């Protein structure tokens, strides 16, 4: 595995923390300043969350079959940012609903894509350790960008959050480009370690393997 690609993956996890959730908690503040009612804000945020939940399963399938995970991750990051920036120009109900649904669907791809890229770089033997590093960088990214966002909102207003998100998106794309495509083993990213690996089980294994089904239901309820 390439040390450069692994470091770039950590930086990707750091910067993507601010991109993944769009405006995050600042969305409610932004819409309240535009004279939205709390119940309307809550409804549309719920719609976006439900859209993201429904997209989780197909996002996993698409990630598993894709051989262009970096490009796909760059695409969903750009889509989240662009649909969020729409809110600055229009706060119509239809525009906000479109933004939240699109952002929710795109955000569902981020976790599986990061996991797939990680597995493709480290194979199974190094996956757990690298995922731990990814999460550490991701939480650090959440912490620092929240501090910066709070300072920006305090001094320059909520509009500065849009600029911050655009900047972190650009930094995410730069970090993604630093991951060498040739370092990602697409077969390993799907759990295939060698040519002798038996064919991967299908979706039906969930219903034949009780512990796996319980784990899946638990994760679904968690979300």
Residue ranges and their predicted role:
Residues 55-68, 153:
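Helix-to-loop junctions at the C-terminal end of transmembrane segments
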Residues 71-85:
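Structural signature of the two symmetry-related core transmembrane helices
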Residues 167-189:
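C-terminal membrane-cytosol helix-exit motif in multi-pass small-molecule transporters
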Residues 101-138:
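Cytoplasmic helix-loop-helix junction between adjacent transmembrane helices
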Residues 2-49, 213-218, 223:
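Helix-loop boundary and gating motifs at the non-cytosolic
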Residues 43-61:
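Central cavity-lining transmembrane alpha-helices of secondary-active solute carriers
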